[in-house]
Amino acid sequence: REFQGDSFRFGRSLRFDVINALTIDVEDYFHVEAFANVIGPNDWCRYPMRVESNTYRLLELLDRRAVRATFFMLGWVAERCPSLVRQILDGGHEIGSHGYGHQMISRGDEKAFRRDVGRAKSILEDQTGTKVKGYRAPSYSITSKTLWALEVLGELGFEYDSSIFPVHHDYYGIPDAPRFP
């Protein structure tokens, strides 16, 4: 394996260009899986939101460096921060869906997943006026046991998913998944 400028060369024949992608999950501290047993969705409104101010700071940094990213946004955040959605889009960034309520796919069924993701997609598309093409599952929770979610995403009109990691982990990952598309 050899790195040459903007590409990798493997042996004599296999070569591919290096593509760097920056993606950001737009969620607040109380949404994370580590707090799921302590702070439930009905309690989220009791906590001060930090996601808006932190994301604005991040947008300023990206703008100074002329860097574009994909922001996978929770529908819950989009409902409460519509100006943030607009600012992300106006900065030339892509907006993807991170679902509505940051629920691990394995904790629900297909019907609940479809409802959550459809709700978020509708909110984001209404606010942006553009089609939301990408999706990332909360806590990367598409696993070998929840691959049915990919079919649902296709049925909802998503063009790509960014939820699968080729790693061993207690909550996420598909160890034998390919590292490259």
Q: Which residue stretches match the model-derived regions?
A:
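Catalytic alpha-helical scaffold of carbohydrate-active enzymes acting on polysaccharides/glycoconjugates
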Residues: 14-134, 139-181
